[in-house]
Amino acid sequence: MKPLPSEADPGYPDSAMQKIVIAIDGYSSCGKSTTAKAVAAELGYAYIDTGAMYRGVTLYLLEHDIAFTDLPRIEQALHEMQISFKRNRQTGRNELCLDGKIREDEIRQMRISNSVSEVSGLPAVRHAMVRQQQQMGHKRGVVMDGRDIGTTVFPDAEVKIFMTADTHTRALRRQEELAVKNELVELADIIDNLEKRDHIDSTRAESPLRRAPDAVLLDTSHMTIDEQVDFVLERASAALFAPAAGSSERNGG
């Protein structure tokens, strides 16, 4: 990864004065979370995996036998459940906590993947999660990835990236992720899951997956993670330095 300018460099934006929001949207298994985590670490920003939050809601509903059509019970559940993140000091990852318990491994299972798009499309769920996400990032200095960050959660984000990749590449990546956790799934089943989720996410009435008009398209089909991270960091650097450059020019510098 290419390093950003150091704080010793003249003109480095004062971290206490200037913070931005980096919104990374796109399809599942394009490398959003891995890229977003690395970018956040490089900038010293908070990282929020909004997809994990919807997976947490899905897990809660399944474990409490709440039908996805039972809207009154879902609204009650949203008031009862507590979703937060806890940093794992050994791995450096932010892990999802549901009612105070780390549930990171459970929310990544295929049974959750098969239902999360349906749950995340429910208006009550969407509204509750968007409110919480906006509260988490209201001080800025955050990298957030999901489906509607640049269009709904933070439409004023200074950096917007929309990630995509071909379905076969995405399926291979997801299969590798699951295999690491000893969950062996046929590639055809993963492709079917991705295609169904793409359709649901893109056609739902509430905050559909779409590229914001001012988002930069990033096809990660043939890119390494380092290349993806550098791509985002370059745009973050431009956003951070643009106001400073403008101020310098106005002052005759």
Model-derived segments and spans:
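Walker A/P-loop
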Residues: S33
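ATP-dependent NMP and nucleoside kinases share a basic, alpha-helical "lid"
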Residues: E104-K181
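N-terminal phosphate/diphosphate-binding loop that engages ATP/GTP or pyrophosphate donors
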Residues: E42-I107
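NTP-dependent small-molecule kinase module
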Residues: C97-E104, L172-K181, I200, R204-G253
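Small-molecule kinase domains that catalyze NTP-dependent phosphoryl transfer to phosphate-bearing small molecules
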Residues: N88, Q133-R140, R147-T152, D156, ...
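Hydrophobic anchor at the beta1->P-loop junction of P-loop NTPases
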Residues: I24
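ATP-binding Walker
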Residues: C30
